[in-house]
């Protein structure tokens, strides 16, 4: 019934098995990949023909994690998987980015790749094996795809590169880098690092590419026995149309791209495009030689040619800069004084307002992943409204691009954040992109660094980011610093680098062509370093290090530690005690399992009141100390005073006042606030208190004069 084929190799010390022919046989391509004991199913389906009028390649990648893969049941009311998590969205992008450039130009059939995590061994991250499985499914499908690709994760532990480290090894690694590519070239890099130098990062990319070569060989071996017949696809030849268009539009298009201001340049380009359409699609012609989609596609290709030729020939760019110059930068902090920290970062026509908010442990994000529930104390959210590019558009929940850009900036900043023990705050940063003309994610990195320093968060060092581009034709190439939006769309590489003056903290690279050599990547990294250092210098004009104190409106957090066996007493039955403390003091209180207590409030008085209350519950009263208390009961022989949390003690009638007392109620009544001194404990462990040795007005001890009896004892010497 089944015609199965499989290959198995040893990869980084674990078995990798690729199998096809048994599961999902109605898909164009399907591969079940097993790495260690992590199992993923990748399927691909592509429509037999493009939709009418389709003018782009509609590729969708869906990565999904099933909770049964880790032996769990989903939370929530419905108890089933819902909308994609942030991690699922990020891995979907991770798979999409290296495979998208390998579909031929002109292929516009609706194509969907679905990768499902079926089993997770909690040792091997499923993202890399999902990339491998998707590549294998595409290679077997017969769909026009210039693969296969391989992918690998690289760690850097004790000065050594590690291929596909286990999940528990990543805690020791100063690098988390995922690289994907073909046998000849790198296509995608995504990484987070702890201030590593450029040569170490480049070495990791090369190490990773070498590391996934056995995987590509295995996919090719499987394809030799299991691949479907390739689909026929003959891209249309538009060279004649392009030459004709070049003849009538080249000069005007070149002049349009000499305009440095974005809006004016776009208007000039649109005018040329309208003229071209009018020429090739004159009104009244029923069956024109070319469709509007063909003319638009060829015109876009012509734009790219003119921009690229100009850069390679003149070393001058669209906005007049040379290859290495960064656009003018203006940095401001304290833009929104009632927020905890804020910054405005403007680089050319790209601008971000970034706001930092400090919270408590209650504000931490709970993340439910296949590896278990964990709490995240740093969140970074990136918003890209349509007005930032002068357009109208959809508003609502963030899209994949916004989630991906936010995570890139998050990776860049996180290594510089203080440890929770040093700075026990939850941090949320929001980047509002208000203008965009290239590299808004790197503007977010810079703005986040500024806003956190403005908020008083003790960053180890400021962080800046820069986007690099590449134009390559045959042996000629130009590496561009701080690319514009057009240079991103029309170029061959988008290479984002973020870090401090000492090293790289985050790197993301997407390459659209083959042939990017180690030499070119090295040039780009070193050129990016110069740009990054320049940007850090410009940022320092606004603020160069974190403020010494938090903003006026930020909450204060005081940390105290209590014995673990006292946690129950502080919380109380059903949370009664801690609720009372919160209600009466106004402070927020978070108690962790190890006895760490975080008390938060914008008022120092509220924090101190809560701290004293908790201290009174967990601490033992000390003999000789003076405490404030409340009379809770009176009797003929004295008064009972609640003086130390829930602890009561007796003030004998002889200790109520220095003079003789006939009746307890002559001195105190229930509810009275009094000062008492702990004199000691009787033979049964009962507390003995005294009021007469304490000045009831000031709470200070009364010093007995010479010859007077002290504390009810013998006369002092």
Curated annotation (Swiss-Prot):
Annotated KH domain ranges read 555-614
Q: Where is the S1 motif domain?
A: 624-692
GO BP terms: mRNA catabolic process; RNA processing
* The entry's keywords: Cytoplasm, Magnesium, Metal-binding, Nucleotidyltransferase, RNA-binding, Transferase
Main EC class the enzyme belongs to: transferase
Q: Which Gene3D superfamilies match?
A: GHMP Kinase, N-terminal domain, K Homology domain, type 1, Nucleic acid-binding proteins
Tell me the superkingdom of the source: Bacteria
Q: Which family does it belong to?
A: Belongs to the polyribonucleotide nucleotidyltransferase family.
Please give the function described in this protein's UniProt entry: Involved in mRNA degradation. Catalyzes the phosphorolysis of single-stranded polyribonucleotides processively in the 3'- to 5'-direction.
Q: What is this protein called?
A: Polyribonucleotide nucleotidyltransferase
- Organism lineage string: Bacteria, Pseudomonadati, Pseudomonadota, Alphaproteobacteria, Hyphomicrobiales
């Amino acid at each position: 019934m089944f015609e199965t084929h499989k290959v198995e190799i040893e990869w980084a010390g674990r078995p990798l098995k690729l199998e096809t022919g048994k599961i999902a046989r109605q898909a164009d391509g399907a591969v079940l990949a097993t790495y260690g004991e992590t199992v993923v199913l990748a399927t691909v389906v592509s429509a037999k023909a493009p939709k009418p009028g389709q003018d782009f390649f509609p590729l969708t990648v869906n990565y999904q994690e099933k909770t049964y893969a880790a032996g769990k049941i989903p939370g929530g009311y419905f108890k089933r998987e819902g909308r994609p998590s942030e991690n699922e969205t990020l891995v979907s992008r991770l798979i999409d980015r290296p495979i998208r450039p390998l579909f031929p130009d002109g292929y516009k059939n609706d194509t969907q790749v679905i990768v499902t995590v079926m089993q997770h061994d909690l040792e091997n991250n499923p993202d890399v094996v999902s990339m491998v499985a998707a590549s294998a499914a595409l290679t077997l499908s017969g769909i026009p795809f210039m693969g296969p690709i391989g992918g690998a994760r690289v760690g850097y532990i004790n000065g050594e590169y590690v291929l596909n480290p286990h999940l528990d090894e990543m805690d020791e690694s100063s690098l988390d880098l995922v690289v994907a590519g073909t046998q000849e070239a790198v296509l995608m890099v995504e990484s987070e690092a702890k201030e590593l130098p450029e040569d170490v990062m480049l070495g990791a990319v090369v190490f990773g590419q070498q590391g996934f070569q056995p995987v590509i060989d295995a996919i090719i071996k499987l394809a030799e026995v299991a691949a479907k017949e390739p689909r026929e696809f003959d891209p249309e030849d538009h060279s004649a149309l392009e030459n004709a268009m070049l003849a009538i539009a080249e000069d005007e298009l070149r002049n349009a791209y000499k305009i440095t201001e974005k809006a004016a340049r776009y208007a000039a380009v649109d005018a040329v495009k309208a003229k071209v359409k009018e020429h090739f699609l004159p009104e009244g012609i029923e069956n024109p030689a070319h469709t509007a989609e063909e003319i638009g596609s060829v015109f876009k290709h012509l734009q790219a040619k003119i921009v690229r030729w100009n850069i390679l020939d003149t070393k001058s760019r669209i906005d007049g800069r040379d290859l290495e110059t960064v656009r003018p930068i203006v940095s401001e902090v304290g833009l929104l004084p009632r927020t905890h920290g804020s910054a405005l970062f403007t680089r050319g026509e790209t601008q971000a307002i970034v706001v930092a908010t400090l919270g408590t442990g209650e504000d931490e994000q709970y993340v439910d992943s296949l590896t278990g529930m964990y709490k995240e104390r740093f969140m970074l959210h990136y918003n890209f409204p349509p007005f930032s590019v002068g357009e109208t558009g959809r508003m609502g929940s963030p899209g994949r691009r916004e989630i991906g850009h936010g995570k890139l900036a998050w990776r860049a900043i996180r290594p510089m954040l203080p440890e929770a023990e040093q700075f026990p705050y939850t941090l949320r940063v929001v980047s509002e992109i208000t203008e965009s003309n290239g590299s808004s994610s790197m503007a977010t990195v810079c703005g986040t660094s500024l806003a956190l320093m403005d908020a008083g968060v003790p960053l180890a060092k400021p962080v800046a980011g820069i986007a690099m581009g590449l134009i390559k034709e045959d042996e000629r190439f130009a590496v561009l610093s701080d690319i514009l939006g057009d240079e991103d769309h029309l170029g061959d590489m988008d290479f984002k680098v973020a870090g401090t003056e000492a090293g790289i903290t985050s790197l993301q690279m997407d390459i659209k062509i083959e042939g990017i050599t180690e030499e070119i990547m090295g040039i780009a990294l070193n050129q990016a370093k110069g740009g990054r250092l320049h940007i850090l210098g410009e940022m320092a004009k606004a603020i160069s290090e974190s403020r010494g104190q938090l903003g006026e409106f930020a909450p204060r957090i005081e940390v105290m530690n209590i014995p673990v066996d006292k946690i129950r007493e502080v919380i109380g039955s059903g949370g009664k005690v801690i609720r009372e403390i919160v209600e009466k003091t106004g402070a927020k209180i978070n108690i962790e399992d190890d006895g760490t207590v975080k008390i938060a409030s914008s008022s120092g008085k509220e924090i101190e009141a809560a701290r004293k209350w908790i201290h009174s519950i967990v601490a033992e009263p000390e003999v000789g100390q003076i405490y404030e208390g409340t009379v809770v009961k009176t009797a003929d022989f004295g008064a009972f005073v609640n003086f130390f949390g829930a602890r009561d003690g007796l003030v004998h009638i002889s200790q109520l006042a220095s003079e003789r007392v006939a009746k307890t109620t002559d001195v105190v009544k229930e509810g009275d606030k009094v000062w008492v001194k702990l004199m000691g404990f009787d033979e049964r462990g009962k507390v003995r208190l005294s009021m007469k040795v304490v000045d009831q007005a000031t709470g200070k001890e009364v010093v007995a004069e010479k010859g007077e009896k002290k504390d009810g004892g013998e006369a002092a010497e």
